[in-house]
Regions:
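Acetyl-CoA-dependent GNAT
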Residues: 11, 19-97, 101, 106-108, ...
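Conserved GNAT acetyl-CoA-binding A-motif
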Residues: 126-137
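Conserved short alpha-helix immediately C-terminal to the canonical SAM/SAH-binding motif I
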Residues: 118, 142-145
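C-terminal "cap" of GNAT-fold acetyltransferases
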Residues: 139-143, 151-152, 161-178
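Extreme N-terminal starter segment of soluble prokaryotic enzymes
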Residues: 2-5
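Active-site acidic-Proline motif in GNAT/NAT acetyltransferases
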Residues: 106-112, 140-141
Length: 178
């Protein structure tokens, strides 16, 4: 197996990153249930197994990377044999917070530690830059991303229905950086 390397993205990576298959298949969804009571609203998420795997359209425009990559504080590319196989894009937010807006791994390289490597690079970048917290946003149907967040100690911290252009629910996970 090829050794995976993580480094800052360079211009030559962009065509391969934008052309990557960004879609994911999921067997579960976090289903939102809102219950209104006299003095409160209770939001509960239940993990529900779907009758069959569903394909998920990536909620962001992959081609926007060409315009945004120089404006982002950091974008990391994962490589195998000098070929881009994944990337992670970060944004700064007020209050010493960093936000992972894109985390994509080529289908042939999924479940091989690539996303974990990218996330570790983002966390190291956040610590070096003095960020206190790192946030991840994921679609409520993206079970692989939810599992990744949980595996790395990220805690569920909120949601926004109709967050994406696809009108999907976004789940937010965060962890403190040390």
């Amino acid at each position: 197996m090829s050794e995976i390397q993580i480094r800052p993205t360079i211009a030559g990576d962009l065509p391969r990153l934008m052309g990557m298959n960004h879609a994911v298949k999921s067997e579960y969804v976090w289903q939102l249930e809102l219950r209104r009571e006299s003095d409160q609203i209770v939001a509960t998420f239940h993990e529900v197994r779907l009758p069959r795997p569903i394909p998920l359209t990536y909620p962001n425009n992959p081609f926007a990377l060409a315009d945004e990559w120089t404006r982002r504080p950091a974008i990391f590319t994962a490589l195998a044999d000098n070929n881009p196989i994944g990337y992670l894009s970060l944004m700064d937010r007020p209050g010493s917070v960093a936000w992972v807006s894109d985390l994509v791994v080529s289908p042939d390289w999924r479940r091989r530690g690539v996303a974990s490597g990218l996330l570790n690079a983002a966390q190291a970048w956040g610590v070096t830059g003095g960020h206190r917290r790192l946030f991840l946003e994921v679609q409520s149907k993206n079970q692989p991303a939810i599992r990744l967040a949980q595996k790395h100690g990220y805690e569920f911290c909120g949601y926004n229905d109709h967050y994406y252009l696809t009108q999907d629910v976004a789940l937010f996970f965060a962890r403190a950086l040390k």
